[in-house]
């Protein structure tokens, strides 16, 4: 806690500007974009899964999942939507509202929302932090399975070493500094 993990994730995803250096994605410094182009780039290239789920209670599960696409003026690919919601086990929950779901179900909705726009990168900030052990393991397995199946890069911020051990690459941060970088 307080080591800079979430700050790093926010900088990598363009939510916060770095105080120095560049953030290159596909060789392009994303902070060279105008604010409007940055917003479009994030909507089309990045998905986000937060510890607090960040679902809108006044919208149905379906509308929460489709929100990033709608903000971009796009409609969901109905076949892909059906595939994602089935894979996540929420296909029967689409007409419900977030407050009617368990924490694990809400996190699956957040995962579906992050995947539906077919982003290249999914950023997950402590995605298991508010879940019990079983729901947390299920969430990690679903995130990993979805990223593998849909060819996405998954970047997870966690303080849980058991979660970190499942990663292809582990970057350890202490007091805002990278202290190890392992493949």
Predicted regions and their residues:
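ABC family nucleotide-binding domain
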Residues: 1-166, 170-172
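H-loop (His-switch) and adjacent beta-strand-loop-beta switch element
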Residues: 170-182
